[in-house]
Structure formats: C-alpha cells, structure tokens
A protein has these predicted regions:
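Gram-negative/organellar outer-membrane beta-barrel architecture
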Residues: 1-89
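C-terminal outer-membrane beta-barrel translocator/porin domains of Gram-negative envelope proteins
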Residues: 59-163
Length: 163
C-alpha cells in the first residue's frame, strides 16, 4: 500500500486577448492526502483501491480587485484496474471508477460573487459526483499502437469549474 501527501501552489492569469481587459488572475493552493491499496497484482492484472482527501483554496481577482475567494473540499474513493495480454501483438485495458463527495464554500467570497452564484449556477454547498474511465490500447508494433478511451462524470448538481 501507499500513503502520501501532496501540496501545490500556483498563480494563474488569463492571457487571451478576449479577456485582457479583465486583468484576471489569482493564486490557487491545494493540499491533500491519498491512500492506494493493492487488491490484486499479477503479471497480467492489477486492481487497487484509492482514497483521496483534498482541500483547495481559490482567489480570483478582476482588475486588481478580489472578486471571489472560496474553498473546495473533496473526499474520493474508488477502484483502478488494468489487464494486459503478455503475448506479441498485445493489448492493455484499464478502467477507473471514483465516487466523490465534496463541498464548495463561498462564505469568504464577495457578496457580488455569492449572489451571482445563487442566481445562476448554484455551485455552493455539498455535491456528489461519479467519475469513470475506460481505455483500451492495441499494440501493432513497438512503435505503433491504437488507443480508444472514454471518460465521463455525473454530478447531482452544477459543479464549480475546478471540479
């Protein structure tokens, strides 16, 4: 099994000419812990259970004025699996399924941002989401392969863009 901690901090700014007049920028901090527990591990097949707890802090400025300041907390649990054919012309199939429960807290944001959210997207509060993925890679030669994949997510309400 593997237990870990992750921390990141970055600053963003919008550089497109379409948004230059906004001077949009801000810092984003993220911290979390994760646990990965192998369930099955053979030469061909691998299955593991993943659990993640993450908190994010966002601050968005428009024209040097703070427009929004909010947090996002997320607990995710799920399964990651893969299988591989070990013969020549081999292939690999992988899948993942993660169930998450989270919370967006806008209480430190401006009144304008909270009111706009309440009148439109309504992202504040708790949410649940299910993320899934399935991929298959077929190898033809050492240098040539074909990859087909599908990924998606379902949520019980509108999500913040960070989710």
């Amino acid at each position: 099994w593997r237990l870990g901690v992750r921390v990141s901090s970055m600053n963003y700014s919008l550089v497109s000419d379409d948004y230059a007049g906004l001077d949009a920028k801000g810092p984003i901090q993220s911290a979390g812990v994760f646990l990965q527990v192998p369930w099955l591990r053979t030469a061909r097949d691998r299955v593991r259970f993943d659990a993640n707890l993450t908190t994010n802090r966002y601050k968005h400025e428009l024209n040097a004025v703070t427009y929004s300041r909010y947090t996002s907390d997320l607990l995710s649990m799920g399964w990651v699996a893969s299988t591989m054919n070990l013969l020549p012309g081999s292939n690999q199939t992988s899948m993942d399924l993660m169930l998450s429960r989270g919370r967006i807290n806008l209480s430190d944001s401006t009144a304008e941002h909270r009111e706009a959210d309440a009148a439109t997207l309504q992202t504040e509060g708790t949410f649940s989401k299910l993320k899934f993925g399935l991929a298959h890679r077929q190898f033809f030669t050492r240098q040539t392969s074909l990859l087909a994949s599908v990924r998606g997510q379902w949520a019980d309400k509108n999500l913040d863009g960070s989710e």
